[in-house]
């Protein structure tokens, strides 16, 4: 488990204190994929780099599997960092070294394996990320997605328990992003790695994360399971991210629906309820009529969900709304 206990970070810039992270406490369970989302300057990169002490905290404690990382001396920190892999937005590969040599670098620096053992480990890692045929190529000969796969293989070289991902997909096109996220999900599932990733894209969180923390101005303003936070956002920052990811403009929707009669509600379904014939059943039981104004079905990681915006008229509306609630469907009255 990764635990933050009242951790904060302040920089001294031009004689002034700039707070990048306000006192923060939260925990990440082992084997979890935890996402931090926020706009530029929200403090997410600072928080991520505090975990392996690329940044030094100004106060508080960071505890990993019972060990206080913030109290480690140089030798202890060196040992701890072998348990933490990291991948970066711009790959950080050495241009003069081959793919295999880039992956071997942390093993060579550790000095604990023979050359034959390193070669075997590198071959295993390149096979895992699908680059066995590219071992002798140089970074300049690779696509962006292939470079990031090399970065992932290198990060896994020392068999870490934790993988930190610093905007790992923001420099990639959508198709390549999807393939890299699928690889990270496979690594999490097969190796039981704890993954902490930061991003400014809600779609990245939705595809691979179990839990999410939303950051704004150095504060985690909302935290919870991805399904709860994504489908039922509470903080204005979270709501903006959701609206941006779904390309929703609420003011435009209000204008579009202004002429529509009846009550307007938004229903959110999760799991098997997404496919249940609930609307028809409720309409027959309560006599209401409905018009579908907007809708979508998608997945949050492996969980199907659906959202419908309805105009409801006639019949017993109160009974219909109670029926929706009883069916474990989240209902929001928009008008």
Curated annotation (Swiss-Prot):
Cellular component GO terms held in the UniProt record: plasma membrane
**Primary localization:** membrane
Q: Which Gene3D superfamilies match?
A: 3.30.70.260, P-loop containing nucleotide triphosphate hydrolases
Q: Which UniProt keywords apply?
A: Amino-acid transport, ATP-binding, Cell inner membrane, Cell membrane, Membrane, Nucleotide-binding, Translocase, Transport
Among the GO molecular function terms of this UniProt record, one is: ABC-type D-methionine transporter activity
Family membership: Belongs to the ABC transporter superfamily. Methionine importer (TC 3.A.1.24) family.
Protein's name according to its UniProt entry: Methionine import ATP-binding protein MetN 1
Which species does this protein come from?
Answer: Pseudomonas fluorescens (strain Pf0-1)
From the UniProt record, report the name of the gene that encodes this protein: metN1
